[in-house]
Amino acid sequence: MKLQKPKGTQDILPGDAAKWQYVESVARDTFSQYNYGEIRTPMFEHYEVISRSVGDTTDIVTKEMYDFYDKGDRHITLRPEGTAPVVRSYVENKLFAPEVQKPVKLYYIGSMFRYERPQAGRLREFHQIGVECFGAANPATDVETIAMAYHLFEKLGIKDVTLHLNSLGSPESRAAYRQALIDYLTPMRDQLSKDSQRRLDENPLRVLDSKEKEDKLAVEKAPSILDYLDEESQAHFEAVKDMLEALDIPYVIDTNMVRGLDYYNHTIFEFITSVEGSDLTICAGGRYDSLVGYFGGPETPGFGFGLGLERLLMIIEKQGITLPIETEMDVYLAVLGDGANSKALELVQAIRRQGFTAERDYLGRKIKAQFKSADTFKAKLVMTLGESEVEAGKAVIKNNRSRQELEVSFEDMMTNFENISEQLLS
């Protein structure tokens, strides 16, 4: 058997990993500005944590979860999304306690797992950035969280981003709409895809979310959920729209958007961008005011979003955005002869401990090959260290671009490399 990575997974090599680290760093910095703290939850959860919260009839649970029984006969699943594990942790760790400052603002970055057909920007192991805010029913929370995602996209330079907005209302208004949708779709049941015929019985709102051509045709003239909002739901949605306008965040109303998870109420949203003529969802989320109670905690409002890192990086690449990744090395040591081996290690370590990036040759290559490595690493400074330099206790350091040189003692290198660097690079 040829040993290779499983289907739908990837190896992220150093050149690409630098881009991942940059995007993750910008996300962390942005979320910190909004007073969010990082949470890390297990990669696997008890099956019920996901099935009961995400919804037994969703595609995630019925088709896409990686689940198994462990050696203790416990039903376990690899997490397919981030919200349910964070809510479970919020309840289990009693973050609802009065002494904990509200709202509780959390973000996470990590792997998720879904068994689905691998395609561009969508893998079986994928990486998600997500945020969850607990304890505030204020529509300003909805808008602040949406604005935070918008702020992140601005920082990354992503263009042509459109906010799509809808409201699912309260449980009561959603139930009234559910019945209206059943009444509308039942006469055309035979025209729906097989999946949507099942959804009509189990979760009719999901028919609106279908990507199948026949389903899209069927729901074109479906009733709008906004016509079924009760007074409280309408007021919440109007406040969200007003505050988005106050922040100059443009939006479009999309009444067919329902989101693929069962726990949402009131505001739901997606950010969509255009890549090579196709619309791609870059980020999605919404409000979920009953989920904490569902996990055995006190009734607690919640709002959050998730975005896929693979898709985000694909969009960055397709839009021709150059990420400002530091690729230059401060100094490269070319090493000649066994007599210089130990001193080279000593010097390169001392330079690194002063905060500089440094590399040396370990392979005993010819000097030309070592200088080529220095160029490949984009080294600003190059030093050649042979047995004669070791005997003298000093060596020449050269600016790799201007060719300016400076003879420096080992003692100065090991204690004051910053001054040497400034002299050669200024």
Swiss-Prot record:
UniProt GO MF annotations: ATP binding; catalytic activity, acting on a protein; histidine-tRNA ligase activity; transferase activity
Q: What is the lineage of its organism?
A: Bacteria, Bacillati, Bacillota, Bacilli, Lactobacillales
CDD domains in the record: HisRS-like_core, HisRS_anticodon
GO BP, one annotated term: histidyl-tRNA aminoacylation
Q: Which gene encodes it?
A: hisS
Q: Where in the cell is it found?
A: Cytoplasm
- The EC number on file is 6.1.1.21
Q: What organism does the UniProt record list as the source?
A: Streptococcus pyogenes serotype M5 (strain Manfredo)
Which SUPFAM superfamilies is this protein grouped with? Answer: Class II aaRS ABD-related, Class II aaRS and biotin synthetases
Q: How does it assemble?
A: Homodimer.
The record's annotation in InterPro entries points to: aa-tRNA-synth_II, aa-tRNA-synth_II/BPL/LPL, Anticodon-bd, Anticodon-bd_dom_sf, His-tRNA-ligase, HisRS-like_core, HisRS/HisZ, HisRS_anticodon
Q: Which UniProt keywords apply?
A: Aminoacyl-tRNA synthetase, ATP-binding, Cytoplasm, Ligase, Nucleotide-binding, Protein biosynthesis
Q: What class of enzyme is it?
A: ligase
Catalysed reactions, semicolon-separated: tRNA(His) + L-histidine + ATP = L-histidyl-tRNA(His) + AMP + diphosphate + H(+)
Q: Does the keyword Aminoacyl-tRNA synthetase apply?
A: yes
Q: Which NCBIfam families does UniProt cross-reference here? A: hisS
Write down any Gene Ontology CC term.
Answer: cytoplasm
According to UniProt, the name of this protein is Histidine--tRNA ligase
Q: What is its main location?
A: cytoplasm
Cite the Pfam families for this sequence. Answer: HGTP_anticodon, tRNA-synt_His
Q: Tell me the protein family, please.
A: Belongs to the class-II aminoacyl-tRNA synthetase family.
